[in-house]
A protein has these predicted regions:
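Membrane-embedded alpha-helical bundles that constitute the cytochrome b-like, heme-associated redox core
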Residues: 1-184
C-alpha cells in the first residue's frame, strides 16, 4: 500500500466532510439574510441536519483513523512544521466535533427536534431557552474558529502545492499519482 497517501476511505471522509461543513456554514449565512418563511425554514433545517450528519461522519472518521494509520509526514517538513500540522489537525478534529454538538444542544434546548424530511428525532432535552441562547453564542464563536482554522488548512495546502511544490496535496487526492519524491 502507498503510505505516502491517505487511503481512499480517509480521502472520502475528508472531502465529504469538507463539502458538508462548507454547506453548513454557507447555508446559515444565507438563511440569516432570507425573509422569514418556508424556504428560510428549510435552509435552517437542512443546516441542522447536516450538522448531525457531520457528527456521525466524524465519529466514523475517527474510528477509521484509529484502525488505519495515517501516512508519515514528508521528511522535507521541519519538526516545527510537523508539530504545527499535527496541532492544526487536532484543532480541526476538536472543532468539527464541538461546533455541531453545540448546534444540536442549541436546537434541543429550544425544544426542537432534528428533522431529516422522512423522519425526525425528538429533543432528548428539556427546553431551556436561556441556556440555548448561551450555547448558541459559543456555537457561533466555535464555528468562526473552525472556519479560520479551515482557511489556515487550505492556505497551508496551497502553499505546499504552489510555493513548495512538494506534491503534499496528492496525499488527499483520489488521483493515483504519488506525492513528489515518493514512490508507491
Amino acid at each position: 500500500m502507498d503510505r505516502a497517501r491517505y487511503d481512499r476511505l480517509a480521502i472520502l471522509f475528508h472531502w465529504v466532510m469538507a463539502a458538508l461543513i462548507f454547506y453548513a456554514a454557507a447555508s446559515i449565512l444565507i438563511a440569516d439574510d432570507l425573509p422569514r418563511g418556508a424556504f428560510r425554514d428549510l435552509i435552517k433545517t437542512s443546516h441542522d441536519s447536516v450538522g448531525a450528519v457531520v457528527v456521525v461522519l466524524l465519529a466514523l472518521r475517527i474510528l477509521w483513523r484509529l484502525v488505519s494509520r495515517a501516512p508519515a509526514m514528508p521528511s522535507a517538513m521541519t519538526a516545527q512544521q510537523q508539530r504545527l500540522a499535527k496541532l492544526a489537525h487536532l484543532g480541526l478534529y476538536a472543532l468539527m466535533a464541538m461546533v455541531p454538538l453545540l448546534g444540536l444542544a442549541t436546537l434541543f434546548l429550544r425544544g426542537r427536534g432534528l428533522e431529516f424530511g422522512f423522519f425526525s428525532i425528538a429533543s432528548p432535552l428539556a427546553a431551556n431557552r436561556a441556556l440555548s441562547r448561551s450555547i448558541k453564542e459559543v456555537h457561533e464563536l466555535a464555528a468562526y474558529a473552525l472556519l479560520a482554522l479551515v482557511a489556515f488548512h487550505v492556505a497551508a495546502a496551497l502553499w505546499h502545492q504552489f510555493i513548495k511544490r512538494d506534491g503534499l496535496m496528492r496525499r488527499m487526492s483520489f488521483s493515483r499519482s504519488s506525492p513528489a519524491g515518493q514512490t508507491p
